[in-house]
Amino acid sequence: MECDRISTLPDHLVAKIVSYLGIKDSIKTSVLSKRWEFVWLKVVGLDLKNCDFPPNGIASQMVVNKYMEFNSGLHMQYFKVNFGGNTVCTNRFLEWIATAVDRGVQHLDAENKNPVIIKEFMPKKIYKSKTLVSLKLAIKIFLKARHFISVFIVLQGQSIVQFSSRCGTFS
């Protein structure tokens, strides 16, 4: 006779186990039982590509929105989102980045190949983060002045310190 040992584990440990699954499989665990319904939302980070939920990225945006809304008090270890071409442009992309920084994200990796119309380049909170260890941004943006800019930034560990110490805006 088989024994169900996973059901006896505490929620935080079950969430840790689920965090090793891909996002699609993590979400699938929500139908296992009432206890598992929100486990995928309790993982310490989000790693999502819009190709996980084709065809147009709307489902991907819904997953990110649900995760951000459910975990308002959670400290995030990582936030990785990738919206490729052919997806519906989201106006919440930069808001998600700011929210992740607010939650003490350590590893931020955000890519959006769809142009985003913005007033400012990046949320100012990103420059003041005390927890950010690695930063990778690849975002196409339209500034209000109607100039098109494509940005790709990759900073890790000491590079962030060097980058921020050499820029007066960050001091």
UniProtKB/Swiss-Prot annotation:
InterPro entries per record: F-box-like_dom_sf, F-box_AtFBL13-like, F-box_dom, FBL60-like
Pfam families given in the database record: F-box
Cross-referenced Gene3D superfamilies: 1.20.1280.50
Domain F-box, residue spans: 3-49
Descriptive protein name: Putative F-box protein At1g32020
Highest classification ranks of the organism: Eukaryota, Viridiplantae, Streptophyta, Embryophyta, Tracheophyta
